[in-house]
Regions:
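Conserved acidic
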Residues: 48, 75-78, 82
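Post-J-domain flank of DnaJ/Hsp40 co-chaperones
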Residues: 38, 44, 104-118
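The canonical J-domain HPD catalytic loop and its flanking helix-turn segment that engages Hsp70
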Residues: 38-43, 54-77, 89-95
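Conserved alpha-helical segments that form or flank metal/cofactor-binding pockets of metalloenzymes
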Residues: 83-108
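N-terminal J-domain/J-like co-chaperone modules of DnaJ/Hsp40 proteins
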Residues: 3-63
Length: 118
C-alpha cells in the first residue's frame, strides 16, 4: 500500500517514502516505513550488499544531522530521526536473519517460538 503524505513546509502532496520534498527541497517529516522502503528496494530477500552499502553512505551524506545544524529545529529533528532510522534499516538489511524477519513482517507473517510461520 502506497502512503500518501503532505510536505510539512510547502504542503505539496507526495506518495511513498521520500527523504526530501521534490517541490521545496526541504527534508520530509519522517513517516512510518520499513527497511526496504528506506532504501528504495523491492521487498525481496536477495539484495546486492555492495550496492546497499554504497546507497547507505550516499543517503547518510544527504540526511546527516550535521548538514541541518543551522536550519530550522524541525529540519534538524527530522534529519536526526531519518539518520537514526536509516542506520537501523541498514543493520536490518545487512543481516540475513533480520532481513528475512523484515520481509515476513511486511507480508504479514511471523515466526513463533517453535520456528513455525503463522
Amino acid at each position: 500500500m502506497i502512503t500518501k503524505c503532505v510536505c510539512w513546509n510547502c504542503k505539496s502532496q507526495y506518495e511513498g517514502f521520500q527523504f526530501f520534498c521534490l517541490v521545496c527541497k526541504k527534508i520530509h517529516k519522517p513517516v512510518s516505513s520499513n527497511a526496504f522502503e528506506q532504501f528504495g528496494l523491492e521487498h525481496k530477500f536477495s539484495i546486492d550488499l555492495k550496492k546497499l552499502e554504497m546507497n547507505y553512505y550516499f543517503l547518510q551524506d544527504r540526511i546527516h544531522p550535521d548538514k541541518f545544524i543551522n536550519l530550522s529545529s524541525e529540519e534538524s529533528l527530522y534529519s536526526q530521526i531519518h539518520s537514526s532510522n536509516l542506520n537501523s534499516s541498514y543493520e536490518i538489511l545487512k543481516n540475513v536473519v533480520s532481513r528475512c524477519d523484515e520481509l515476513l513482517k511486511f507480508f504479514g507473517q511471523t515466526i513463533d517460538n517453535e520456528n513455525t510461520i503463522s
